[in-house]
Amino acid sequence: MSEASLPKAALLCIDDDEALLECEKAFLETFGYTVVTASSGPEGLKLAGHHSFDVVIVDYNMPTMSGQEFAIAMRRLRPLAPIIMLSAATDVPEQALKVVDAFVLKSCLASRLLPAIELLCGSESLPPYSYDA
């Protein structure tokens, strides 16, 4: 099987903005990723408890369970799961960034999300997060 025909990573995307979530899904699927979506942290944790994902992408600012709370719970469930946090805000607290592997501003989504996913899928040693201001 050639590298080009190998399936790409399975991603879990979590965001309470359903329209944006569908856009993320469609965008990532055009690059060959398998994408499962959840509209809340608890729903995402339930999916992660039953399925294995190569990368988890979570919005920081969500009701019920924030992206930071989700990431902490996800680390308990699957300690090695790579997590990318997204936010429209540039003032995400440092403690939230410390529990994820990468951070991407939503304003830079189109140019920064794919490189972050590829890095997390292919790298054995990553910094705790990368902040794109």
Residue ranges and their predicted role:
Residues E69, A89-P115:
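Alpha4 helix (beta4-alpha4-beta5 surface) of REC/receiver domains from two-component response regulators
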